[in-house]
Amino acid sequence: MDCKVVSLNEKDQFIPKIKSSDPVITGLFQYDAAQQISFEKRMSKENNGREAALANVIREYMNDLKLSSEQELNIQHLANGSKVVIGGQQAGLFGGPLYTFHKIFSIITLSKELTDTHKQQVVPVFWIAGEDHDFDEVNHTFVYNENHGSLHKVKYHTMEMPETTVSRYYPDKAELKQTLKTMFIHMKETVHTQGLLEICDRIIDQYDSWTDMFKALLHETFKAYGVLFIDAQFEPLRKMEAPMFKKILKKHQLLDDAFRATQKRTQNQGLKAMIQTDTNVHLFLHDENMRQLVSYDGKHFRLNKTDKKYIKEEIINIAENQPELFSNNVVTRPLMEEWLFNTVAFIGGPSEIKYWAELKDVFELFDVEMPIVMPRLRITYLNDRIEKLLSKYNIPLEKVLVDGVEGERSKFIREQASDQFIEKVEGMIEQQRRLYQDLLDEVAGNQNNINLVNKNNEIHIQQYDYLLKRYLLNIERENDISMKQFREIQETLHPMGGLQERIWNPLQILNDFGTDVFKPSTYPPLSYTFDHIIIKP
């Protein structure tokens, strides 16, 4: 597999500004992610003393998996005080978008580089956001149908949308297998298809909860790298979090004030507010099989779906004795994660690292230091066919990744059209505009006639526009094969107006290039970069 790094002319300059140590951006974080001194400081930080307990919890969480020797060793390293590189993601259908895998590769890559540079073991940890309850965000994925040259949405359907956390959701296995079958119908059959389908079927048969199936697929892919997995909703982990839940409940107003103040500061720097929430407690409570947002009304802590209410002593008692009923929101999850782990760096997507920028004062309030916040690696897969099509139409890869192919497609259509025809139509439009102005001069002062001339001109211009558009449409139809090839490029490299990794599913890559494609024996060794990586399987 070939691998190269390209620099894109990105529309969003947030990550390039992190790369260049822009003082406005770095001032929003505890550490400058582009400076080596930041890593030296984090590597030398004193541990929090929770590493042995965490190692036991992670071992318990992963005990339904057959651990690799690399994972066994990393659990020991964690128990002995090794620091971590960490990142997380929602449990998406069949692994979710490709960037989930790329986030894990980012964690693996950075932890290895830190281990090699500092001669200290750094452990890669992936945090599964099983506490989330927005099932609409994880119940679907997309598949590229090569025969049609188009993307198709594949969705796992439920009779009723679950309101509990995804870790507490147990999908209908027959329906899930039907969803899997639908996905494979759209994918081309390769020598890898049957083996991949058997792996997915086995996971569905062997595991019951939504997040356990997700975990099993990730484990199958990344176990050889020694990646450790933990679900935010895992009950033994929640028991570890009880002291922090109590602190959050006791300081909820100060927490909310700190968050709002930091968010306002980021907005004053010209950034858009990322975190949208009305709560002033920033926790959820599981009640009546629903994940319910907690808010404080001045006297009571209230739940948003059943309107149950608790005085402070009651809700703190729940945190003490039943911490598994609590879960974090977007504000408290990073805080809890860093309170638990001895983290060198957190790896996040472009939006994630922006919302971490709104939390600096929250970390300081709880005397928890924000780690180095790093953007994940961004990766695109380029197959031989698409590379040949780019060459055929002389389209720069970097341009497609940023802008798509619409501009190049329109340019191609104009090149196939008759210049004389287009010039004559455009000349007729210009002639009409001159005639229109002459007629307006003739009827000046007579509003009825002015309206008549305006309407007549509008009809003529519309007809000329229609003539030109239909002519170019006919050119498109005459070049149907080329139009299909432009669609192929678009749906592969810039689907739905964005990067491939945001839409495509990992199963597509596994089906095309083999079930070992992401394994260390096949996948190219990566180096951490702020730029874009192109991989040719």
From Swiss-Prot:
The keyword Coiled coil applies. Keywords: Coiled coil, Ligase. InterPro entries: Bacillithiol_biosynth_BshC, CC_BshC, Rossmann-like_BshC. Residues 422-450 form a coiled coil. Its EC number is 6.-.-.-. GO terms for molecular function: ligase activity. Belongs to the BshC family. Involved in bacillithiol (BSH) biosynthesis. May catalyze the last step of the pathway, the addition of cysteine to glucosamine malate (GlcN-Mal) to generate BSH. This is Putative cysteine ligase BshC. It comes from Staphylococcus aureus (strain MRSA252). The lineage of its organism: Bacteria, Bacillati, Bacillota, Bacilli, Bacillales. The gene is bshC.
